[in-house]
Amino acid sequence: MNKKLLRARRALKLRKKLYLLGSVRLVVYRSLRHMYAQIVSEDNCNVLVAASTTEKLIASKLRVTGNKEAAAVVGQVIAERAFKKGIVHVSFDRSGFKYHGRVQILAEYARQFGLKF
C-alpha cells in the first residue's frame, strides 16, 4: 500500500466517527504548496466557512504559502470567519494527516482565535 491510500483510509475512518457525532467539522487539507481549511455542516452538504492560501487576501500576507507561517494565518482567518457566522464548537477533521507540523499549527491558531474542539 502506498502513502496516499493509507491516508485516505485513515480519513474515512475518522470521518465515519465524526459523522456519527453529528457535529460541524473543521476539515483541513494540505498540499506541498497550499493549506486549505473548511467548516462543513453536520449533514456534510454545505461548506459554511472556508479559508486557504490560494486566496489573494491571505497569499498577499505571505512570502511562501506552504509553510507553518501560512498554516498559522489560515488557522487565524478560519477562526475569525467562523466566529462572525456564530460557529464556536467544531470537530477537527485532519483528513488522515498526522497531527504534526502545519496541521498542528493550523489547529493551535484556530483554537487561539476562538474555535473550540
Curated annotation (Swiss-Prot):
<protein>
    <recommendedName>
        <fullName>Large ribosomal subunit protein uL18</fullName>
    </recommendedName>
</protein>
<comment type="function">
    <text>This is one of the proteins that bind and probably mediate the attachment of the 5S RNA into the large ribosomal subunit, where it forms part of the central protuberance.</text>
</comment>
<keyword id="KW-0694">RNA-binding</keyword>
<dbReference type="GO" id="GO:0003735">
    <property type="term" value="F:structural constituent of ribosome"/>
</dbReference>
<dbReference type="Pfam" id="PF00861">
    <property type="entry name" value="Ribosomal_L18p"/>
</dbReference>
<keyword id="KW-0699">rRNA-binding</keyword>
<dbReference type="GO" id="GO:0008097">
    <property type="term" value="F:5S rRNA binding"/>
</dbReference>
<dbReference type="GO" id="GO:0022625">
    <property type="term" value="C:cytosolic large ribosomal subunit"/>
</dbReference>
<dbReference type="InterPro" id="IPR005484">
    <property type="entry name" value="Ribosomal_uL18_bac/euk"/>
</dbReference>
<dbReference type="GO" id="GO:0006412">
    <property type="term" value="P:translation"/>
</dbReference>
<comment type="similarity">
    <text>Belongs to the universal ribosomal protein uL18 family.</text>
</comment>
<comment type="subunit">
    <text>Part of the 50S ribosomal subunit; part of the 5S rRNA/L5/L18/L25 subcomplex. Contacts the 5S and 23S rRNAs.</text>
</comment>
<keyword id="KW-0689">Ribosomal protein</keyword>
<keyword id="KW-0687">Ribonucleoprotein</keyword>
<dbReference type="InterPro" id="IPR004389">
    <property type="entry name" value="Ribosomal_uL18_bac-type"/>
</dbReference>
